């Protein structure tokens, strides 16, 4: 299977997000890379599902709370940017303060 660098990045994000999802389901608090992967993958899937950019941006702030992550992680993630594929093309989505 031949994948472009972008496709490889998407698979890496998905794999890290899957691990984060499983750890969260077991009651573990997510660390920085897990939290970023979890939110990023959810944003990409929401875009793929046909939500608008504004809906995806708002959705990104509802995925995790301070109780879901290790101490200090929310401050380490002032914003998340991801190029997501929407039905009308690829767009850059920025979520400010994704963990309120």
Swiss-Prot record:
InterPro entries registered for this protein in UniProt: Urease_gamma, Urease_gamma/gamma-beta_su, Urease_gamma_sf, Urease_subunit
Reactions mediated catalytically: urea + 2 H2O + H(+) = hydrogencarbonate + 2 NH4(+)
Pathways per UniProt: Nitrogen metabolism; urea degradation; CO(2) and NH(3) from urea (urease route): step 1/1
Cleavable signal peptide: none
GO terms, molecular function: nickel cation binding; urease activity
Biological processes annotated in GO: urea catabolic process
Keywords: Cytoplasm, Hydrolase
Compartment(s) where it occurs, according to its Swiss-Prot or TrEMBL record: Cytoplasm
Transmembrane segments: none
Cellular-component GO terms for this entry: cytoplasm
Major enzyme class: hydrolase
Any Pfam family hit: Urease_gamma
EC number of this enzyme: 3.5.1.5
Matches recorded under HAMAP family: Urease_gamma (MF_00739)
Oligomeric form and interacting partners: Heterotrimer of UreA (gamma), UreB (beta) and UreC (alpha) subunits. Three heterotrimers associate to form the active enzyme.
Family that this chain belongs to: Belongs to the urease gamma subunit family.
PANTHER family reported in the protein's UniProt record: UREASE
Protein name as annotated: Urease subunit gamma
Species of the source: Burkholderia multivorans (strain ATCC 17616 / 249)
Gene (UniProt): ureA
């Amino acid at each position: 299977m031949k994948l472009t660098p972008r496709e490889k990045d998407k698979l890496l994000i998905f794999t890290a997000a899957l691990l984060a999802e499983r750890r969260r389901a077991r009651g573990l608090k997510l660390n920085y890379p897990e939290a970023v992967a979890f939110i990023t993958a959810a944003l990409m899937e929401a875009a793929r599902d046909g939500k608008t950019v504004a809906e995806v941006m708002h959705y990104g702030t509802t995925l995790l709370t301070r109780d879901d992550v290790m101490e200090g992680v929310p401050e380490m993630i002032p914003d998340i940017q991801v190029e997501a594929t929407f039905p009308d093309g690829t767009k850059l989505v920025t979520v400010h303060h994704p963990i309120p």
